[in-house]
Amino acid sequence: MTRTLRAMRQLGALLIVSVAALSPAAAEPTIIGDKNGEDVVTVRGVGTTQSKQKLPIFPGISGETAGATGLSLLKVVIPPGASAEAHVHKGYESAVYLIQGRVETRYGEGLKKSVVNEAGDFIFIPADVPHKPTNLSETEPAIAIVARNDPNEQEHVVLYAPDDARNE
């Protein structure tokens, strides 16, 4: 893949996020219920934000939105041909359900290991394991639901850039 094509994909991913951020759906979510720990809380109308990993996310359940104290749950979209920034979740596990698409995840020290997942797969990522998901489709977004045992979803995300790994 040429650098120009790679740059165009990254720009396209940023444009998708930028346009989504301008849409009415990007408004603050409607919270139904009290975050006091005694009510069932519904989070509705959640807009798109950009994660530290440079992907559009739709925050759902977290400490901030629902008063969760031990987990977060969100929807992640990987635009066609795009990748997340390589990263780790310091001290926290992740569980992913891939709703749509095919995704290659490079992982481990130096991102030297790889797994390809498809719609319907459940994926477990142990705490502190570096990983970088890439949407294998050039035309369709990959969509996943992600759960973490971290109510502050983005707070413990640390970008990963080892000297010996090329994060293309």
Report residues per predicted region.
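Bacterial N-terminal signal peptides
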Residues: L11-A21
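A short beta-strand-loop-beta hairpin characteristic of the jelly-roll/cupin
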Residues: S83, Y92-E118
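Ligand-binding loop in jelly-roll beta-barrel domains
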Residues: E118-A119, A127-Q154
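A short, N-terminal "cap"/entry segment at the start of jelly-roll beta-barrel domains
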Residues: A25-G70, E85, V158-E168
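Conserved short histidine dyad/triad with adjacent acidic residue
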Residues: L74-H89
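Short beta-strand His + acidic residue motifs that chelate non-heme Fe in jelly-roll/DSBH
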Residues: E85-A86, T105-R106, S114, I125, ...
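Extracytoplasmic
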Residues: A68-L73, T139
